[in-house]
Amino acid sequence: MVGKSTLLSVLASASVAFAACSLDSHCPEETPCCSQYGECGTGAYCLGGCDPRMSFSLESCVPEPVCESASYTFTSMDGITSNTKYLGDASKSNWVYSGSPVIYNDNVLLTMSANSVGTVMASSTYMWYGNVKAKFKTSRGQGVITAFILFSDVKDEIDYEFVGSELTTAQSNYYFQGITNYDNELNITLSDTYANYHEYEIDWTPDEITWLVDGQVGRTKKRADTWNATANQWNFPQTPARVQLSLWPGGLASNGAGTIAWAGGEIDWNSEDIQNNGYYYAAFESVDISCYNAKSAPGTNSGKSYYYNSVLGTNNTVIDSKNATILSSLLATGTNMTAGESAAASGSTAASTAATVPGLTGSGGGGVGDNHSDDGSSSSDSSSGSATSSSSGSSSTGSSGFSQGDGSTSTSKSSADSLVANQERVLKGSLFAGIVAVVAMMAL
């Protein structure tokens, strides 16, 4: 087990060695890919979570495998691959993980041992609208956060998050390109999430998002209500996203005060679950993904991969293409997908000073729920409201097929750039995601 002080020392030294990236500071050519944790590298940095807007060029990121409708159960680790081994072949890997997933009683347990930073699993394919359901039991305890979200490479996000000290509340939330707005959060009331399996559902169309629990609508958000007149755009999730399942320590003592308060307080690393099992855990039984299957963009999945043709990162800049998605090695990038091929084929390791797997060499935010670092209130106070699940229908049909802004596909800058300042101050996602792999590798 890695002590917290040791972990932080590793991260501090690593942050000096490798370049950070943002909307204002792109990655250098030698390490061109900006991971979802805000650091530059090659290999896995160029795969899931690579933000093309912050990378050396749009082409630095490897194209994203298109949506595939599928039902997943978790009776074994087949199809679940470590992010240290995944090279972009979604036909061989359904899920990519950091941390320590465990198969138990036909569930995959996302585990978090004492003083660790948890586990995340992300789908290898991307949904561009559609429907996703996950059946699971959350973890429990103050400071312990379970999450089921959709997260795009340009940081569009649709969330379910669960605070372990509030077991009758599911927090629903959404973000456009990582822009924080705590008024977007709404609570859904339900029975004990640790004791009971519930089926959580996100129905996402170009016109609205519906959150359902056990088939009952808990919340609906219409795109028509998200217009930003200043930026001349819809602040609505609209780009291809991976499904992400996670367990993370919102109540880690080193986290910001706002995050700890939102998470219900500091984690008890000597709790009943730690003593009896050796870890906190969330139990996921199944995930069902249904693609949107539009006949014309947005929302198609007729090709092999998605890529962006503009730094705007909106739905009218997404191209459904036949471009390849598989790297030859962890030295490769979107512009040189065969780098390191000879070394990989021979089984040797090519020399490189570049970071190749996000999280192994640095910390950061990025991609698994919101860190709530600007919010000093508790989760029950920070929500803009609550809603009890009610019976009503949800449909993925009848979309207008909207195109962002004025509908152009220009690669020039637009009024969207007025939001850059807000985006720059946001570290999206859980505090753990960027450092899970450090713990995993150091424990080997």
From Swiss-Prot:
- GO CC aspect terms: cellular bud neck septin ring; fungal-type cell wall; side of membrane
Stretch forming the signal peptide:
1-19
Proregion residues excised on maturation: 416-444
Q: Which GO biological process categories is it annotated with? A: carbohydrate metabolic process; chitin metabolic process; fungal-type cell wall organization
User: EC number(s) per UniProt?
Assistant: 3.2.1.14, 2.4.-.-
Positions contributing to chitin binding: E161, W248, T259
Lipid group attachment sites (GPI-anchor amidated serine)? S415
Report the PROSITE patterns cross-referenced here. Answer: GH16_2 (PS51762), PROKAR_LIPOPROTEIN (PS51257)
State the compartments where it is located: Cell membrane
Ranges for domain GH16 come to 57-271
Record Gene3D superfamilies: 2.60.120.200
| Name of the protein in its database record | Crh-like protein 3
* Species for this entry: Botryotinia fuckeliana (strain B05.10) (Noble rot fungus)
What is this organism's lineage?
Answer: Eukaryota, Fungi, Dikarya, Ascomycota, Pezizomycotina
Task: Tell me what gene encodes this.
Answer: crh3
